[in-house]
Amino acid sequence: PALFGGVYYVMTKTYSWDAIILSIPSMLVTVTLLYIHTVMDFDFDLNEGHKTVANSFNSQLDSLIVLKWLLILAYVTPLLLCIFDILDWQVFIVWFTIPLAVDLYKSMVDFSANAESIPEHKWYHFPMENMMNAPSFMTRIYQSRNLMIYYSLFLALAIILALN
């Protein structure tokens, strides 16, 4: 949110709470990408003594509760933006990415059980050339990256449509 607020200030020379509030959903999916990385590094970070949110849980699987809540909040926040009349109903276009979020979560559950597992290839996983030969770790980073990109693009579209 501070980044969005700062960019808004540089462009307009005014401060706006709207810019910060509108950035919260996008921030949640960005934090999801970062958190997924720490979940996949769970054992390494634990062995190296690195303190992360993920390794504060008893197991890698237990740490997925934070991921679940990040994803839930990412999809509830647009509803709140609509309820509080910050954005119009167009904001629900981000809900088209819910299947990607569910797929990502299931993929992380599989990773927790078997770090070498490769998720089933879906049309929205591109660009991931040679996906079946990509390491399991990178495949999930790409999944999370794609969710972040699609979600943010749909959110930007909703904001643009609300301005008209």
Question: What residues fall within each predicted segment?
Answer:
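Solvent-exposed interhelical
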Residues: M27-I72
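Hydrophobic alpha-helical transmembrane segments
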Residues: P1-T32, I65-N164
